[in-house]
Amino acid sequence: MMARRDPTSWAKRLVRAQTLQKQRRAPVGPRAPPPDEEDPRLKCKNCGAFGHTARSTRCPMKCWKAALVPATLGKKEGKENLKPWKPGVEANPGPLNKDKGEKEERPRQQDPQRKALLHMFSGKPPEKPLPNGKGSTESSDYLRVARGPMPVHTTCKRPRMDPVLSGRSATEMSGRGSVLASLSPLRKASLSSSSSLGPKERQTGAAADIPRPAVRHQVHETLLVVEPTHSSPEGSCREVPQAASKTHGLLQAVRTQAQDKRPAVTSQPCPSAATHSLGLGSNLSFGSGAKRPAQAPIQACLNFPKKPRLGPFQIPESTIQGGELGAPENLQPPPAATELGPSRSPQMGRRTPAQVPSVERQPPHRRPCLPTAQACTMSHHPAASHDGAQPLRVLFRRLENGRWSSSLLAAPSFHSPEKPGAFLAQSPHVSEKSEAPCVRVPPSVLYEDLQVSSSSEDSDSDLE
């Protein structure tokens, strides 16, 4: 009988019995884990609580049914005062209440001292206290309410200025602003130094011998009027106009009489300090005060002639021997400029009839602007053909749009290019068939000249 029993079946029966017994012991609802099963050293990664791990069934993130609601420990009635009430006044105050009463009486005793100080600063006589205690209440009211000196309202107004003077001052201020804005830093420095002087010093230094009309109850001051010349903005000294003062209540006849008696005085050139700082001066016109000051054109005291700037291929006028008006000139550029191209042609020999007036030498003067359609002839290169023919001449014309057009012309022969002063002694009256010896130039130079002139003509035709 014992040999027939299978050990495996017996083991299976034992496991079933144990599981059934555990199921019977398990409670129906969720139960709280015992405190001995919690380990504070463990921390759950899902919920972040201590005492269990992420694998534990006690984690509320895994099993929401097993999550426990935290129970309240009890109500705290003293936390919130839902029924506030005021404590009643006790008939027999204790020691604490007595201390409070003493603290309140001390500031009342200090009231007379404060009152005396306030009377000293305010200057009011002290008030006598009344027997019924009204003085104490008034003193406390005086301390509580901030009182100060009443503002004094005056009816006096500012004197109104004469409309003529106000208009003139406005125009003078605007003129002064425009003059200061247009001045250079050196002019501003000199102007500030001149304006720092007193009005009496300026009057005596600028024009000390200017007669003034003797009019009763009227004061005139010199008024500096400066107008910049049209030639250059830096050619004249600028002075800040002085404001002229007039008295009120003058008749129109007195004003007209003062204007009739006003002398026209022309002042001397600018002071030496201003001339040294600026380099140029101006004539100033002085006049007595009126509605509009008399203005006169002012010319520069020192107008130095400007030296004409010469281009890289231009010739000074002192080296030219002369020629007829409007005669074409044959110029020869230096050998270093043979590789520049057609862009240098407008600067090589720009000469007008006004620049060559006669055969005799004359001092240099300012060159006028070149007209838009005035021709200027010159030789392009000192190159001649290989068979000893005439050299080339190029005629340059200035178009309306500011560009230049060139054309080839026959020209007389030139001297050797080794002598740069040969073109100075040549006369512009040489005929086309000159008897001067010709210079033989290789054909490559001639071909280069023709190529340059043709390219310039093509560019001009494309632009047109």
UniProtKB/Swiss-Prot annotation:
InterPro entries from the UniProt entry: FAM90, Znf-CCHC_6
Biased composition, class Low complexity, residue ranges: 180-197
Record-linked Pfam families: zf-CCHC_6
Residue stretches of biased makeup (Basic and acidic residues): 74-83, 97-114
UniProt xrefs under PANTHER family: FAMILY WITH SEQUENCE SIMILARITY 90 MEMBER A11, PSEUDOGENE-RELATED, PROTEIN FAM90A1
Family: Belongs to the FAM90 family.
Miscellaneous section: Primate-specific FAM90A gene family, thought to have arisen during multiple duplication and rearrangement events.
Protein name, entry field: Protein FAM90A20
Provenance organism: Homo sapiens
Gene that encodes the chain: FAM90A20
